[in-house]
């Protein structure tokens, strides 16, 4: 049907689709009920919600830029943890940038986009969210494998494997996000279209939901196993310091699981209801979709706090980066700022130097296994 509610001839819809005309987006939005109460496609007022969305996306971008700059410039360690942190930060940075572009191209600008541009706008956000989720899955898998299989592995082999899995994460995320652009959509098949994302097929959304639900369930299962391993290690530890370390790890795992449930649960529930619900239901909860999507994107702002600032090494890197920036600008902050920066540099050098004897142990037959096992099982997990 068209904007006035009269049916649209299939041949005219196909002609619009073949020509990539923006009028096709108006037809799909009108059929799904998204134009109800808007005053027409030229009504672009989003008000305070749009401002909050822009602020949230800018927060995600700036926060991840800060962590990325600090990690790459002030962390000397190049273990697998380093590459996982960089990968998670990059994916969260892309999530914030994609969400910002999505918000700025929404409203009245939506109806000036060609269908391919609309698919690119939404697909980029799907790709970024998928890359962030797959990166968290890879990190959880590496962390679990390091705990249950503390076997010596050459640095080159480990690095190649990490690079391979990171590349696979991004390849799968890009493929998942661009499937509608490649043809899995519902152009001119209005009965198969989503109500919340009018050009997306309900089957495609259900496919994404199954994948994301499987990934998140796997992540929670891995962290549940890590929780039990760390709890068992803490109970067996005879020293108070080891027990405190185990409790710190337990708190980190609980924070990760809670962040996933709070940030991702509402979005999955909304999309699942969209697949099996009606257009009337979608119209009623349309405004809630914007808030729920913003909540999911805010998970990319929570990730640097959980994964980075719970690590003393990354905390030192961020503090050193900020203090060095202030000193370059000639700003003298609190008296302990310079002292903390010096401490951060000395701590990083100490960490770096402590890794060198570990390499020499690899050449020693008598100390080859027992000296590395505790470092692989506990301290590598603690560093995220």
Curated annotation (Swiss-Prot):
It is found in: Cell membrane. The chain crosses the membrane at residues 51-71, 85-105, 118-138, 162-182, 207-227, 253-273, 289-309. Glycans are attached at residues 2, 30. It holds the Pfam family 7tm_1. A lipid is attached at residue 323 (S-palmitoyl cysteine). Residues 1-50, 106-117, 183-206, 274-288 are extracellular. InterPro entries: EDG6_rcpt, GPCR_Rhodpsn, GPCR_Rhodpsn_7TM, S1P_rcpt. Residues 72-84, 139-161, 228-252, 310-384 are cytoplasmic. It comes from the Eukaryota. Keywords: Cell membrane, G-protein coupled receptor, Glycoprotein, Lipoprotein, Membrane, Palmitate, Receptor, Transducer, Transmembrane, Transmembrane helix. GO terms for molecular function: G protein-coupled receptor activity; lipid binding; sphingosine-1-phosphate receptor activity. Specifically expressed in fetal and adult lymphoid and hematopoietic tissue as well as in lung. Considerable level of expression in adult and fetal spleen as well as adult peripheral leukocytes and lung. Lower expression in adult thymus, lymph node, bone marrow, and appendix as well as in fetal liver, thymus, and lung. It is a multi-pass membrane protein. GO terms for cellular component: cytoplasm; mitochondrion; plasma membrane; presynapse. GO terms for biological process: adenylate cyclase-activating G protein-coupled receptor signaling pathway; G protein-coupled receptor signaling pathway; regulation of metabolic process. Receptor for the lysosphingolipid sphingosine 1-phosphate (S1P). S1P is a bioactive lysophospholipid that elicits diverse physiological effect on most types of cells and tissues. May be involved in cell migration processes that are specific for lymphocytes. Belongs to the G-protein coupled receptor 1 family. This is Sphingosine 1-phosphate receptor 4. It comes from Homo sapiens (Human). The gene is S1PR4.
